[in-house]
Amino acid sequence: MGNESGEWIMHGMNWDNPDCIHSVDEAIKYINEFGFLPLFKNDIDGFSLEERTVPEYWWSDNPEIDPWMWRAIIARRHDIVYGKFFDKKAGFISKKWLPVFANYRRDGYDFDALYDDGKAPNKHKKIMVNFMENNADSEIYSNELKKQAGFGKDGEKGFDGAITNLMMQTYLCNCDFKKRVNKRGIEYGWDVAVYSSIEHIYGYDYVTSCYKDNPQDSWKQLVDYMRKMYPEARDKQIRKILK
């Protein structure tokens, strides 16, 4: 998705193109086969879900053909993780590749150790305590998490930025998108992001299974794979999207 002369333009392909992704199941298959994929177009041509779908079907509110709705379905199924993983923008990581990303992005640190070593700010700690120890399997609405973590008018600032940073470090993901529920148990409003730890999706042992490797070796594995799959991509472009 690009802004051209003040107008947002979607980039994609025709329905009858043999490379076109037509359904959420096809999207899941493609992501699992490739391993990871940004949601929207970026500096590497072809490396996004957007560019492999029909532009006119985005935000059509038809789950059969709307890629914007697919992202919520994929997040909800807990087979592939979804979040802001690519240059602080949204995308998907398969179960196969998640440990490699986690080892590199976390530099081999669990969050509590990262914080204890002075490498994470207190505002991140206030968010993460809601997903650690007895809260390890929590799934929390964005608006509720903001309150629980002490963000708001008279509290911490920069909630959205903190969430994005924790996703980039692969500590959190979007595990669902749901409508809020009022006191009478009735859903209302727009769908709201629901967050969880990535360990909640895949389990601690699996997520940390590459901790035994040097984080720079995991980085090299990611870069070498991208060079193989997108040989035309420049190193600068690869670093930008994967750092």
Regions found by a protein language model. Give the residues of each.
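Long, low-complexity intrinsically disordered regions
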Residues: 1-243
